[in-house]
Amino acid sequence: MSEKHPGPLVVEGKLTDAERMKLESNYLRGTIAEDLNDGLTGGFKGDNFLLIRFHGMYQQDDRDIRAERAEQKLEPRHAMLLRCRLPGGVITTKQWQAIDKFAGENTIYGSIRLTNRQTFQFHGILKKNVKPVHQMLHSVGLDALATANDMNRNVLCTSNPYESQLHAEAYEWAKKISEHLLPRTRAYAEIWLDQEKVATTDEEPILGQTYLPRKFKTTVVIPPQNDIDLHANDMNFVAIAENGKLVGFNLLVGGGLSIEHGNKKTYARTASEFGYLPLEHTLAVAEAVVTTQRDWGNRTDRKNAKTKYTLERVGVETFKAEVERRAGIKFEPIRPYEFTGRGDRIGWVKGIDDNWHLTLFIENGRILDYPGRPLKTGLLEIAKIHKGDFRITANQNLIIAGVPESEKAKIEKIAKESGLMNAVTPQRENSMACVSFPTCPLAMAEAERFLPSFIDNIDNLMVKHGVSDEHIVMRVTGCPNGCGRAMLAEVGLVGKAPGRYNLHLGGNRIGTRIPRMYKENITEPEILASLDELIGRWAKEREAGEGFGDFTVRAGIIRPVLDPARDLWD
């Protein structure tokens, strides 16, 4: 819908059942506490199945054994995924030791999964361990509040270990924004931390009694790195610095990648520039964006409820004017900024504070002791001696941050002995997948388990065509919800069915263009045959410094997506 013909500010109609659930939940309590004591099932029932998401958990089951258990007349092997709230991805070594211990002793899979939302997840928490995991997190100053469902999720912040002063300032703002937009209900503390019920009535001055219409994602990004993939997020604060000091932010609103196969009312969308704001208005503006989306977002259709759809319905200028009105400011013109990349700098980087930072490539973010590569044990050993902190990146990697020169050799020795510094190709460093099977209930095709061998094949093609020192930003997501951020990749695979994917081309290296579907519902051999031909052409015909995605557009292989709300599906 164009600016000239804006739609209604509020969508009238029958509200979704999720709205009923939130309203009746008594500020997210439901009957979760009672359900915890029901030993007849390993899962949560009724509304509680969805309400636990507000407490940072998803109920899942092992899909590899689902059919087998059904044959045995057993319920699915229910277990929870828990996602920690960790603004900016910074975690202390004491906290790391606690989560390592819990993962090893109290989860089915024994792993820590770093995510591209800059936090960690536990998979396979049985119901009896759900309360203990929240209490363990609390004991080391962490929580899982608002990391899922209709709230402001974990706030991302560029992992920039080199410019330590600027990163420190941006990180503080990521924490402040996260805290400011948290729900105020005491449900989390009452249910998981056994804090006593207080007679006062809960109030949610920012989120409201029915919270947001849909999930909401926020970033703080420090150019020229776009490692956090700004355009995948609802609200983005782009850091503007003068003489290395943060002075304000450019605000971009309305990005998001989730689509539904065949539903042309859904689309991925890049965020729209609203303007520049000085630092002192940051929290007021963040609150204004969230409350405008709270009041104007579509509560009659969850597939059309995110901020990107609200912007398209009411018009960018209308939404922006409402944010200005609520925040009591006028945006200044956007200040100049540019992105040059979004990958992590793997290996040692010296910061301007003379400390060293070691970025470790963790394939798919999965930390486990593999045969000959005890990654989990290695990181635990480093955590025991390292005086700085760890930082999870939005590329699912891990930074050992703030290493003094005197400790460098000791940490490198452990990292090398544990397989944490094994050499990988540039292509593998720039490839990513979501979890998908066996734990994700939405998975349509493999992603995390598919990626390593798929990249082996891509590496072979890169060698064949003489471009093995290059990379293509390549991502696999197991379903169109898009957790793997394939809809901002140069080559994006979106799961369609077991062993089949939609192949998207035409994104760019810096993550500012949505790719278009090139081929639908194809197998791995068909994908590789297409990419063999196209990588060969790119190797021969590209211009100096031209990335694969830009080449596919310039060469006319794929039409660029210019206005996704209108031309993504053309």
UniProtKB/Swiss-Prot annotation:
Its EC number is 1.8.1.2. It catalyses: hydrogen sulfide + 3 NADP(+) + 3 H2O = sulfite + 3 NADPH + 4 H(+). Pathway: Sulfur metabolism; hydrogen sulfide biosynthesis; hydrogen sulfide from sulfite (NADPH route): step 1/1. PROSITE patterns: NIR_SIR. InterPro entries: CysI, NiRdtase/SiRdtase_haem-b_fer, Nit/Sulf_reduc_fer-like_dom_sf, NO2/SO3_Rdtase_4Fe4S_dom, NO2/SO3_Rdtase_4Fe4S_prot, NO2/SO3_Rdtase_4Fe4S_sf, NO2/SO3_Rdtase_FeS/sirohaem_BS. Its cofactor is siroheme; [4Fe-4S] cluster. It comes from the Bacteria. Siroheme binds at residue 483. Gene3D superfamilies: Sulfite Reductase Hemoprotein, domain 1. Pfam families: NIR_SIR, NIR_SIR_ferr. Keywords: 4Fe-4S, Amino-acid biosynthesis, Cysteine biosynthesis, Heme, Iron, Iron-sulfur, Metal-binding, NADP, Oxidoreductase. One of its GO terms (cellular component) is sulfite reductase complex (NADPH). GO terms for biological process: cysteine biosynthetic process; hydrogen sulfide biosynthetic process; sulfate assimilation. One of its GO terms (molecular function) is metal ion binding. [4Fe-4S] cluster binds at residues 434, 440, 479, 483. Binds 1 siroheme per subunit. Component of the sulfite reductase complex that catalyzes the 6-electron reduction of sulfite to sulfide. This is one of several activities required for the biosynthesis of L-cysteine from sulfate. Alpha(8)-beta(8). The alpha component is a flavoprotein, the beta component is a hemoprotein. Belongs to the nitrite and sulfite reductase 4Fe-4S domain family. This is Sulfite reductase [NADPH] hemoprotein beta-component. It comes from Shigella flexneri.
